[in-house]
UniProtKB/Swiss-Prot annotation:
Function: Receptor with high affinity for TNFSF2/TNF-alpha and approximately 5-fold lower affinity for homotrimeric TNFSF1/lymphotoxin-alpha. The TRAF1/TRAF2 complex recruits the apoptotic suppressors BIRC2 and BIRC3 to TNFRSF1B/TNFR2. This receptor mediates most of the metabolic effects of TNF-alpha. Isoform 2 blocks TNF-alpha-induced apoptosis, which suggests that it regulates TNF-alpha function by antagonizing its biological activity.
PROSITE patterns given in the database record: TNFR_NGFR_1, TNFR_NGFR_2
GO cellular component: extracellular region; membrane; membrane raft; plasma membrane; specific granule membrane; tumor necrosis factor receptor superfamily complex
Keywords from the named record: Apoptosis, Cell membrane, Disulfide bond, Glycoprotein, Membrane, Pharmaceutical, Phosphoprotein, Receptor, Repeat, Secreted, Signal, Transmembrane, Transmembrane helix
Gene3D superfamilies per record: Tumor Necrosis Factor Receptor, subunit A, domain 2
Protein name: Tumor necrosis factor receptor superfamily member 1B
Ranges of biased composition (kind: Polar residues): 364-377, 404-414
Subunit structure: Binds to TRAF2. Interacts with BMX. Interacts (activated form) with XPNPEP3.
PANTHER family in UniProt: TUMOR NECROSIS FACTOR RECEPTOR SUPERFAMILY MEMBER 1B
Length: 461
């Protein structure tokens, strides 16, 4: 009897264990009413309509039919591009997010159990975020030359730039570069600034000094950390051994620096001297021309009658010099004789008469008792009169009278300088008409002229 009872007890225990561990994956799960003051178990929900505790749907599924008092929830799988990530009792699955844009990268694909996740590409940050991933990306700020990155950008924040401090520089446009320190030089060719590094000159203090072999640390200090210090010490001894030839490059540089101002000064000075020389040559040429003009003007004789008349033509001067050889009394007698002779002659012969009258006035001795016929008394006087006819305009009128004096004391220099001056066609007739006795008398009355030897003897008392 004992073995039978043992087997019966084992069978009952197995049934109880099976009942206690029964799986709730059955399609028709019998809901239950919760006890007062208690809640539904895990992965269950309380339905307000049925007032029963019902089971939830697993991720990737949704509730197709809700539970009742007699039936449990009926679940169904999600469609494509939809998902449910948690235990739920929703009637529809959630839609996956839109595809990633060109500035985004898909880090998680869309499945029935998870949504699609997009993040920003490198160099971009998320300007508008969401629960998972980023909705809108923007490019990171790039710091321009002279500015460095103070705070680098992240997936959700932009870059912060700041100006480079003195002694540092940034010569790039970047969203990651920071300000770097200037290189240290013994001799600075171009000093550095916020956007440019310092430039070191190739001429070192070692070359400028005679005992240059002592300055071995030069290669390390001349270049910054970017240069290679290993080959520099090998070149330093060679530079120190070539010290006698070394000072030539600085001397050439200094000569080139001084050559520009010295050449400029010499060029300006030479140009000034050249201009002064040209001006002096022009002045000397003008000064040499003026005495020649004065000498040419001095050759023309100026008689007292010419000075009284002012500036007259050369023809008028030669016409007026005939008057001083006669006295005032002889001119009066000649004028009276011409007045008596004028009515007897016709008008075309007037120029010839006036010319002859002028010749008589020039050669007359001043006799006051001349005959009515116009024949004057000749006393030791020889008159040569050339009369031009007024009808012949092509001929040149000229008169030349020479008086031969009995007195040998008178020198040829005292006689008037008579020159034969050719006249134009119009002047031959016009001059003869203008030079009437009244004109001759008017010109001679301005200043008394000296009388000749024959005139002095016949001067009326």
């Amino acid at each position: 009897m004992a073995p039978v009872a043992v087997w019966a007890a084992l069978a009952v225990g197995l049934e109880l264990w099976a009942a206690a561990h029964a799986l709730p994956a059955q399609v028709a799960f019998t809901p239950y009413a919760p006890e007062p003051g208690s809640t539904c178990r895990l992965r269950e929900y309380y339905d307000q309509t049925a007032q029963m505790c019902c089971s939830k749907c697993s991720p990737g599924q949704h509730a197709k039919v809700f539970c009742t008092k007699t039936s449990d929830t009926v679940c169904d799988s999600c469609e494509d591009s939809t998902y449910t990530q948690l235990w739920n009792w929703v009637p529809e699955c959630l839609s996956c997010g839109s595809r990633c844009s060109s500035d985004q990268v898909e880090t998680q694909a869309c499945t029935r159990e998870q949504n699609r996740i997009c993040t920003c590409r490198p160099g971009w940050y998320c300007a508008l975020s969401k629960q998972e991933g980023c909705r809108l990306c923007a490019p990171l700020r790039k710091c321009r030359p002279g500015f460095g990155v103070a705070r680098p950008g992240t997936e959700t924040s932009d870059v912060v730039c700041k100006p480079c401090a003195p002694g540092t520089f940034s010569n790039t446009t970047s969203s990651t570069d920071i300000c770097r320190p200037h290189q240290i030089c013994n001799v600075v060719a171009i000093p550095g600034n916020a956007s440019m590094d310092a430039v070191c000159t190739s001429t070192s203090p070692t070359r400028s000094m005679a005992p240059g072999a002592v300055h071995l640390p030069q290669p390390v200090s001349t270049r910054s950390q970017h240069t290679q210090p290993t080959p520099e010490p090998s070149t330093a001894p060679s530079t120190s051994f070539l010290l006698p030839m070394g000072p030539s490059p600085p001397a050439e540089g200094s000569t080139g620096d001084f050559a520009l101002p010295v050449g400029l000064i010499v060029g300006v000075t030479a140009l000034g001297l050249l201009i002064i020389g040209v001006v002096n040559c022009v002045i000397m040429t003008q000064v040499k021309k003026k005495p020649l003009c004065l000498q040419r003007e001095a050759k023309v004789p100026h008689l007292p009658a010419d000075k009284a008349r002012g500036t007259q033509g050369p023809e008028q001067q030669h016409l007026l010099i005939t008057a001083p050889s006669s006295s005032s009394s002889s001119l009066e007698s000649s004028a009276s004789a011409l007045d008596r002779r004028a009515p007897t002659r016709n008008q075309p012969q007037a120029p010839g008469v006036e010319a002859s009258g002028a010749g008589e006035a020039r050669a007359s001795t001043g006799s006051s008792d001349s005959s009515p016929g116009g024949h004057g008394t000749q006393v030791n006087v020889t008159c040569i009169v050339n009369v031009c006819s007024s009808s012949d305009h092509s001929s040149q009128c000229s008169s030349q009278a020479s008086s031969t004096m009995g007195d040998t004391d008178s020198s040829p220099s005292e006689s008037p300088k008579d020159e034969q001056v050719p006249f134009s066609k119009e002047e031959c007739a016009f001059r003869s008409q203008l030079e009437t006795p009244e004109t001759l008398l008017g010109s001679t009355e301005e200043k008394p002229l000296p009388l000749g030897v024959p005139d002095a003897g016949m001067k009326p008392s």
